[in-house]
From Swiss-Prot:
HAMAP family: Ribosome_mat_RimM. Belongs to the RimM family. The keyword DNA-binding does not apply. An accessory protein needed during the final step in the assembly of 30S ribosomal subunit, possibly for assembly of the head region. Essential for efficient processing of 16S rRNA. May be needed both before and after RbfA during the maturation of 16S rRNA. It has affinity for free ribosomal 30S subunits but not for 70S ribosomes. One of its GO terms (molecular function) is ribosome binding. Coiled coil: none annotated. One of its GO terms (cellular component) is ribosome. The gene is rimM. Binds ribosomal protein uS19. This is Ribosome maturation factor RimM. Its main location: cytoplasm.
Length: 179
């Protein structure tokens, strides 16, 4: 598997107590994936970490083979990854919910006009913004290279993950024009 087959799920913080627990900073929307016996990859290594105990109340985690403070200090600031395949298995979506990695690289359309493709998703508190890299034909016409569409019903009509397409209302092109 290549790096693109994995998704960031957490960052490990400082040690907590003397028994090897470390602070877990969840970077996903799915805290349910952090449970006993769950395994994660460490960035840029083939090493896997297996959870021995997870305390959801204070977001601390204890990994097998890191059951003392000195050993656990080696984990500070590491990023944990999970395969996209395993994420699909362990993280259940509700109707009209999508994984970030499924939205990224989707083409964005307003009616028959291709506006661009999603290159990032930003959290703004109450909602999300899709960062769109404008289609070359709009850039050649001096429109901005990047613009943002709020992930709200007013702007996003339909998302078709199978076809990798997002269909927007008439207001999306207005955003591009006025960016």
């Amino acid at each position: 598997m290549s790096e693109k087959d994995f998704v960031q799920v957490a960052k490990l913080g400082k040690t907590v107590g003397l028994k090897g627990y470390v602070k877990l900073h969840n970077l996903s929307d799915f805290s349910s994936q952090f449970k006993k016996d769950a395994t994660f990859f460490i960035k840029n290594t083939k090493e896997m970490l297996k959870i021995k105990h997870y305390n959801a109340n204070n977001s601390t985690v204890l990994f097998e083979n890191y059951e003392d403070i000195e050993k656990a200090k080696e984990l500070t600031n590491l990023i944990l990854f999970q395969s996209i395949e395993k994420s699909r298995q362990t993280c259940k979506l509700k109707k009209d919910e999508f994984f970030y990695f499924d939205i990224l690289e989707c083409e964005v359309f307003e009616e028959d006009k291709r506006l661009g493709k999603v290159v990032d998703i930003l959290e703004t508190g109450a909602s999300y913004l899709f960062e769109i890299q404008s289609d070359e034909k709009w850039v050649e016409k001096k429109y901005p290279k990047i613009f943002f569409i709020p992930y709200l019903d007013k702007f996003v009509k339909n998302i078709d993950i199978e076809k990798r397409q997002i269909f927007c209302t008439q207001d999306a092109f207005l955003i591009l024009e006025n960016s």
